[in-house]
């Protein structure tokens, strides 16, 4: 297993893994945007799986820090906003991947929500890393 030796109890390692997943998400998102519709199944699958992995890892990191040190109100609030940004990113990405006549606002939202997700995730991880 590639990540067999990764100490997932280390918040720092989780932060680095989340950053790596974001690099994969953005790289394949960029490639998808460049390739245009219809989207490559391979590129879309990698993009989606990396997104799901990032969400799961971030959730597990929040859970771990909450169970071991407790979360501050600020960390919980930023975490909730991060979750909402992820939901917006996934929803707009899902609409785009369906194809057909998609309103331009959906494309615009899918350019904004991933950036918002990254900024909020970075803030979340900074707060979590200072806690853990």
Feature locations, PLM:
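Membrane-embedded alpha-helical bundles that constitute the cytochrome b-like, heme-associated redox core
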Residues: 1-132
């Amino acid at each position: 297993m590639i990540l067999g030796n990764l100490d997932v109890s280390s918040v720092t390692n989780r932060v680095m893994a989340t950053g790596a997943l974001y690099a994969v998400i953005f790289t394949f998102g960029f490639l998808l945007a460049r390739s245009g519709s219809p989207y490559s199944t391979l590129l879309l699958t990698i993009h989606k799986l990396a997104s799901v992995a990032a969400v799961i890892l971030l959730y597990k990191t929040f859970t771990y820090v909450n169970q071991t040190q407790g979360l501050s109100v600020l960390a919980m609030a930023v975490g909730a906003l991060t979750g909402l940004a992820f939901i917006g990113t996934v929803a707009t990405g899902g609409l785009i991947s369906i194809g057909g006549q998609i309103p331009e606002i959906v494309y615009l939202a899918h350019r904004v929500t991933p950036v918002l997700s990254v900024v909020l995730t970075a803030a979340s991880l900074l707060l979590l890393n200072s806690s853990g």
